[in-house]
Amino acid sequence: MYYGFDMGGTKIELGVFDENLQRIWHKRVPTPREDYPQLLQILRDLTEEADTYCGVQGSVGIGIPGLPNADDGTVFTANVPSAMGQPLQADLSRLIQREVRIDNDANCFALSEAWDPEFRTYPTVLGLILGTGVGGGLIVNGSIVSGRNHITGEFGHFRLPVDALDILGADIPHVPCGCGHRGCIENYISGRGFEWMYSHFYQHTLPATDIIAHYAAGEPKAVAHVERFMDVLAVCLGNLLTMLDPHLVVVGGGLSNFEKIYQELPKRLPAHLLRVARLPRIEKARYGDSGGVRGAAFLHLAEK
């Protein structure tokens, strides 16, 4: 059995998956804000409850909105203060008497999609999240590529490519990023960036859902904005594809629901790839909100 915890700022969700990778049980509880011992006790209690339900001890994986230290498993996650700076992996492993694996929730998203029955046929899978920010994960032969510092999937912190400046104008502001740098692509091609660019060019603020609705109705500003956004997205993704050369790209996050992306990217990407490059398959994520739990559960499966 495979147990996956999706640990967020407000809730902890546990999903239990059988040997056929089907979810057979799940439970949600609130996340303690500040109390680390309470957090450990909740995770222990949920694990033991799952063991009782299954009649066996399952493997345990945890997805967090942050980064585990690559050397000692210490957790860095501002969204879960009770776990921030704590040796969660070592402490919980000791409490439940089995190895616990922890990874970034974006990597868990990518792993979940890569283990889809159809997608498993692809040797390299790029999970790309276009949500409040931009991130994701790279899966090679069913396993996460984390990198030395566990930041392989931090795609949103690439700087805006020079070709994007041709589209947006050389005077486009280099927006300050939460990472401490300026001009990171997540400030332009995320859902938040989608709204910011509209506001920048038209001095009018609208939520992404309204912009897309205006686009569907043929409103000229919204149409021009979407065209510009798709061009910038193609430039940024083209750079990423040239570097990683995946067989499959799976798109998640709020903007993944904008179907125009899957129509436009295949037409616009070739101009930004090497001539010998073949386009990867580009698909919308299949597992939605359950992807984090699935991917966390499969952190052990990926090592088999």
Swiss-Prot record:
Could you tell me the Gene Ontology terms of the biological process aspect for this record? N-acetylglucosamine metabolic process; peptidoglycan turnover
Question: From the UniProt record, which GO molecular function terms apply?
Answer: ATP binding; N-acetylglucosamine kinase activity; zinc ion binding
Q: Which domain of life is it from?
A: Bacteria
Name by which UniProt lists this protein: N-acetyl-D-glucosamine kinase
Where does this protein act, in terms of pathway? Answer: Cell wall biogenesis; peptidoglycan recycling
**Function, please?**
Catalyzes the phosphorylation of N-acetyl-D-glucosamine (GlcNAc) derived from cell-wall degradation, yielding GlcNAc-6-P.
HAMAP family, per database record:
GlcNAc_kinase
Q: Which family does it belong to?
A: Belongs to the ROK (NagC/XylR) family. NagK subfamily.
Q: Which organism is it from?
A: Yersinia pseudotuberculosis serotype O:1b (strain IP 31758)
The cross-references to NCBIfam families, in alphabetical order and at most eight, read: PRK13310.1, PRK13311.1
Q: Which reaction does it catalyse?
A: N-acetyl-D-glucosamine + ATP = N-acetyl-D-glucosamine 6-phosphate + ADP + H(+)
CDD domains the UniProt entry points to = ASKHA_NBD_ROK_NAGK (cd24057)
